[in-house]
C-alpha cells in the first residue's frame, strides 16, 4: 500500500491486509520430495573447550546458557557460538492445554528451561544463527547475505549410528521443493540466501529505550492434529516459530517476549473456517477473555487450516495494544518455521501500523535474498528483514501515540538472566553494551567488559545524554494525542518510564469522543481519514435511514455467515460510516465510493459511504464502519456496534480520588495538573503521576522560588509593622522627622505608615491617608519632604 494509507490522526484502521503466497504445495513430510538430499553431518557440542558429545535426536541432556557447536558444511569447519534466548520467555510464562471435559490445564514451567538459541558463526562478521536444539538441531545458519544453510535432523529410521543431521544450501532446499524462478511472476520465487541483520542496528537498539512485544500464541485444534496430537511437538513448533519471529522483529528494534502458549487440544474455542476474515474476528472476540485474565500486547493464532484463495495471514492495521483488535491469524503453511514466522511477523507488522511495501521500496534485500517482510506477495525464499519504508512508517506510528504498551517494560533487566557482553543488547549484570570492540565508538562504555567509563552514569536510553542521566522532570515522551499523557525522566534511570495514557472513557476532542486504548476516535476524524481534510460526518438522519436497511449501503456489520445486519435506531451512529465532502475518491486503495441520497426537510442530501471492491484480493473488514469508542450521543459511545453508556464507575471512582486536581491514567492512578502533586492531587506540587516520572515546569527554578515567596510574602507585613514599632521612632527623631503618639495603641507611628485597623483596605489597594503632622521643636528638613504626606504620591510596598 502507498503512504496515503497511513493514519495521521488517531485511532487504528481496522483494515485487514493479508499476506499472499503462490498457490503451490508448501506443506510436506519431513523429508523433501524425490531424491533430494543434503550433506550428511553430525554436529558436536563443545564444552569446556573440548569436543564433548555428538548431537543426537533425543531431548538434550544439557541446555546450557551458552555453548559452542562444531559441524562441517561443504568441506568447511563451522563453529557456532550459541546463546540461549533468555528474553524469549517472560517471567510468569504459562502453557495451557485442555482436558477432555474442556477444563483448562495451566502450567507454569521454568521460563529459562527451553532449547531455543541464537548466535553467530565464529570468523564470519555478518553471520547469525537461529537454532532449536530440541530433538536434534534445526534452524538457520547464515554466513553472509549470499551464503546460508538450513540444518535439520534426519528421520530416526535413516540415522542408524551416524550421521544424525542434514545440512542444505537454502537455494538447494527451495529448488528441490519444486518452486521455480519466474521473473515475470507477481510472486517472488528465487534461490534463497537470507540477508544478515545490519550491524548498525546493534548500536541503535542499545541507545534507545527498548520496546518489547509481549506475545501470546495459540495453536488451533487442526494444528494439534497435524502434529499427531503430540502436545510436546506442538509446543516445540510454536517455540521455534516464536524464536524466528523474534529475530525478524529485531530488525525493527523490537524484542519479542513470549508470555504464554495455548494449544486447543480438544476443540477450537473460536470459530475457524476457510474465511480468513470470519476466523480473525471470531478469534479477536475470544481473545478479549484471555487478555482480561493475562494482559499482553498481541495474541496470534496459528492454524492448521487453509484459507480461501492465497491468503495465509490476516491482521487489523494499527491494532496493537487495543483490546478489540490486537491480534492476528496465520496459517502454518510452511514446513520450515522461518516460513510461518515470516507470515506472523508480516501480520504483526500490520498491527504496528505498517502497510504493504510499494514497488521499489525494498532495497535492503532483493528477491534472491528473500525480499522484505511487508511486501504484499511473497514466496520462496522467505523474507527476513523489514524495509526502510516500514521503519519510517513505524516511527510515524510511534510519534502519533501508537503502540504505548510496547514501552511498558522500562528496565530491560526485568526480563533478563545470564548475558553475553558484546552482543549489543543491555542485559543483566551489564552497565552498557555497545557491541563488539571494533564497532564501539561509545565514549561512555568499555566494550571489553560492558562497564561504564569513569565519570559516566549511563550509556543508553532516552534519559541519558553525554554519559549523564538527564535531570528529573526532563520530558522524554510528549503526549501524542488527546488521550495520551507525557512522561518525564526520573533522574535515576536512563530509560523513559512506561507509556501511559488516559483511562478508557475519559472525554476527548472537546467532548465529541471518549478515549479508548489511548486513541480518541471521532466521526470527523474517520471521515477525513477516508476522504481527506474537507470531509465531515453526514447529518444524523443519513445514519438513521441508511443503517436501518441492513445492506451494503448501510448496516451494523455482518454475522458469521456474512449477511449484513440492520442497525437499531439507537445504534445507527455505530454502523456504516457516512460522510459528506472531501475528495471525490477514497484515499485508501481498493475502496470505492457508494453515495446514497435521502430527503431531508424537502431537499436531497447525499450520504457518502465506502465499499471494498470484491475482487481486490483484500479479504478485509468493511473499512467504512464506525470505529469502536466513537461517541454516539451525550455520554454514549459505540461498542460492539451498539451505542452504550460511556459512564464508567471505575473512571468516576478514580476521578474522585484525584480531588478534581487531575485526570486518571491507564494504570488507574491520578495524573495531576500543574500545581498539584501525585498520588492524589491534594497537595501543592509540579503535576504528573507516580507512573510518568516527576513533572517539571518550564523554568526548573521557578517552582522553588514561588514556594519560597509564598511562604515569605505573608510574613512581610507583620515584619514591617514590627520594624516600625521598634526602629522607626528613633529613626524619625534622629532624622528630624515629626512623629505622633497613637493614644489607642500607645506606640509611635511614623508618618505615612498604615494604621493596623486599615490593613485590610491596604491589601485590597485602597490607600489610607497619612496621619496629620504634629508640631516639633525642630524641623531641619526642607519642605520637599512634605510629599510623604501627599496621599496622591503615596506608594505601598
From Swiss-Prot:
Where is it localised?
A: Membrane
A single GO CC term for this protein reads:
membrane
Prodomain residues:
30-204
Q: What class of enzyme is it?
A: hydrolase
Cofactor dependence is on: Zn(2+)
| GO MF annotations, alphabetized | metalloendopeptidase activity; zinc ion binding
Task: Show which residues sit on the Extracellular side of the membrane.
Answer: 30-702
Where in the chain are disulfide-linked cysteines found? 321-405, 361-389, 362-372, 476-496, 654-664, 658-670, 672-681
| Occurrences of domain Disintegrin (ranges) | 418-504
Keyword terms, alphabetized: Cleavage on pair of basic residues, Disulfide bond, EGF-like domain, Glycoprotein, Hydrolase, Membrane, Metal-binding, Metalloprotease, Protease, Signal, Transmembrane, Transmembrane helix, Zinc, Zymogen
- Comment on bound cofactor: Binds 1 zinc ion per subunit.
Chain spans, region Disordered: 766-797
Q: Per UniProt, what is the membrane topology?
A: Single-pass type I membrane protein
Which residues are Zn(2+)-binding? Answer: 134, 346, 350, 356
Limits of the EGF-like domain: 650-682
Name of this chain's protein:
Disintegrin and metalloproteinase domain-containing protein 33
Q: What gene name is listed for this protein?
A: Adam33
Amino acid at each position: 500500500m502507498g503512504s496515503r494509507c497511513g493514519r495521521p490522526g488517531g485511532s487504528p484502521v481496522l483494515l485487514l491486509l493479508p499476506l499472499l503466497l503462490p498457490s503451490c504445495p508448501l506443506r510436506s513430510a519431513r523429508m523433501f520430495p524425490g531424491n533430494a538430499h543434503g550433506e550428511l553431518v553430525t554436529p558436536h557440542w563443545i564444552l569446556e573447550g573440548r569436543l564433548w558429545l555428538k548431537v543426537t535426536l533425543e531431548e538434550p541432556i544439557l541446555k546450557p546458557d551458552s555453548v559452542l557447536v562444531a559441524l562441517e558444511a561443504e568441506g568447511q569447519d563451522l563453529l557456532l557460538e550459541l546463546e540461549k534466548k533468555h528474553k524469549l520467555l517472560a517471567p510468569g510464562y504459562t502453557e495451557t492445554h485442555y482436558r477432555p471435559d474442556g477444563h483448562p490445564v495451566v502450567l507454569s514451567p521454568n521460563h529459562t528451561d527451553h532449547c531455543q538459541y541464537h548466535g553467530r558463526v565464529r570468523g564470519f562478521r555478518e553471520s547469525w544463527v537461529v537454532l532449536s536444539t530440541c530433538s536434534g538441531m534445526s534452524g538457520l545458519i547464515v554466513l553472509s547475505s549470499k551464503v546460508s544453510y538450513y540444518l535439520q535432523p534426519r528421520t530416526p529410521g535413516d540415522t542408524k549410528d551416524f550421521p544424525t543431521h542434514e545440512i542444505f544450501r537454502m537455494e538447494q532446499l527451495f529448488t528441490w521443493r519444486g518452486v521455480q524462478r519466474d521473473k515475470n511472476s507477481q510472486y517472488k520465487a528465487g534461490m534463497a540466501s537470507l540477508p544478515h541483520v545490519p550491524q548498525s542496528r546493534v548500536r541503535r537498539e542499545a541507545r534507545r529505550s527498548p520496546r518489547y512485544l509481549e506475545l501470546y500464541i495459540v495453536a488451533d485444534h487442526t494444528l494439534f492434529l497435524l502434529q499427531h496430537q503430540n502436545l510436546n511437538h506442538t509446543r516445540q513448533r510454536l517455540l521455534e516459530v516464536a524464536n524466528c519471529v523474534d529475530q525478524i522483529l529485531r530488525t525493527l528494534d523490537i524484542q519479542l517476549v513470549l508470555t504464554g502458549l495455548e494449544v486447543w487440544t480438544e476443540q477450537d474455542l473460536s470459530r475457524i473456517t476457510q474465511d480468513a476474515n470470519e476466523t480473525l474476528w471470531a478469534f479477536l472476540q475470544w481473545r478479549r477473555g484471555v487478555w482480561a485474565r493475562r494482559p499482553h500486547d498481541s495474541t496470534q493464532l496459528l492454524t492448521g487450516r487453509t484459507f480461501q484463495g492465497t491468503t495465509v495471514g490476516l491482521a487489523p492495521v494499527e491494532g496493537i495494544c487495543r483490546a478489540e483488535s490486537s491480534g492476528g491469524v496465520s496459517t502454518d503453511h510452511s514446513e520450515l518455521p522461518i516460513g510461518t514466522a515470516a507470515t506472523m511477523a508480516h501480520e504483526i507488522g500490520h498491527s504496528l501500523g505498517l502497510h504493504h511495501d510499494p514497488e521499489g521500496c525494498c532495497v535492503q534485500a532483493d528477491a534472491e535474498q528473500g525480499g522484505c517482510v511487508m511486501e504484499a506477495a511473497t514466496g520462496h525464499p522467505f523474507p527476513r528483514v523489514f524495509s526502510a519504508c516500514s521503519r519510517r512508517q513505524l516511527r510515524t506510528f510511534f510519534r502519533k501515540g501508537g503502540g504505548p504498551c510496547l514501552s511498558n517494560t522500562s528496565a530491560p533487566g526485568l526480563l533478563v538472566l545470564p548475558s553475553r557482553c558484546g552482543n549489543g543488547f543491555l542485559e543483566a549484570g551489564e552497565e552498557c553494551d555497545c557491541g563488539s570492540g571494533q564497532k564501539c565508538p561509545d565514549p561512555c562504555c568499555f566494550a571489553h567488559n560492558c562497564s561504564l567509563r569513569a565519570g559516566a552514569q549511563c550509556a543508553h536510553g532516552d534519559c541519558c545524554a553525554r554519559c549523564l542521566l538527564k535531570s528529573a522532570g526532563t520530558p522524554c515522551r510528549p503526549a501524542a494525542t488527546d488521550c495520551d499523557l507525557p512522561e518525564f525522566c526520573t533522574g535515576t534511570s536512563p530509560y523513559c518510564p512506561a507509556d501511559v495514557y488516559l483511562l478508557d472513557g475519559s472525554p476527548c476532542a472537546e467532548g465529541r469522543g471518549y478515549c479508548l486504548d489511548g486513541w480518541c476516535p471521532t466521526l470527523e476524524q474517520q471521515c477525513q481519514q477516508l476522504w481527506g481534510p474537507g470531509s465531515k460526518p453526514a447529518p444524523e438522519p443519513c445514519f438513521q435511514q441508511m443503517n436501518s436497511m441492513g445492506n451494503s449501503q448501510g448496516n451494523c456489520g455482518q454475522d458469521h455467515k456474512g449477511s449484513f445486519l440492520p442497525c437499531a435506531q439507537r445504534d445507527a451512529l455505530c454502523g456504516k460510516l457516512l460522510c459528506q465532502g472531501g475528495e471525490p475518491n477514497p484515499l485508501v486503495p481498493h475502496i470505492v465510493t457508494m453515495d446514497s441520497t435521502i430527503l431531508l426537510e424537502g431537499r436531497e442530501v447525499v450520504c457518502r459511504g465506502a465499499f471494498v471492491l470484491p475482487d481486490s484480493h483484500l479479504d478485509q473488514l468493511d473499512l467504512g464502519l464506525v470505529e469502536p469508542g466513537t461517541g454516539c450521543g451525550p455520554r454514549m459511545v459505540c461498542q460492539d456496534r451498539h451505542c452504550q453508556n460511556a459512564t464508567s464507575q471505575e473512571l468516576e471512582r478514580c476521578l474522585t480520588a484525584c480531588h478534581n486536581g487531575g485526570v486518571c491514567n491507564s494504570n488507574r492512578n491520578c495524573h495531576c495538573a500543574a500545581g498539584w502533586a501525585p498520588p492524589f492531587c491534594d497537595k501543592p506540587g509540579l503535576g504528573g503521576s507516580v507512573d510518568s516520572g516527576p513533572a517539571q515546569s518550564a523554568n526548573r527554578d521557578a517552582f522553588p522560588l514561588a514556594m519560597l515567596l509564598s511562604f515569605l510574602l505573608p510574613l512581610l507585613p507583620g515584619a514591617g509593622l514590627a520594624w516600625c514599632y521598634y526602629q522607626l521612632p528613633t529613626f524619625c527623631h534622629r532624622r528630624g522627622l515629626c512623629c505622633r503618639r497613637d493614644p489607642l495603641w500607645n506606640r509611635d507611628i511614623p508618618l505615612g505608615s498604615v494604621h493596623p485597623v486599615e490593613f485590610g483596605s491596604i491589601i485590597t489597594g485602597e490607600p489610607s491617608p497619612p496621619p496629620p503632622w504634629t508640631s516639633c521643636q525642630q524641623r531641619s528638613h526642607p519642605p520637599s519632604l512634605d510629599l510623604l504626606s501627599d496621599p496622591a504620591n503615596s506608594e505601598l510596598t
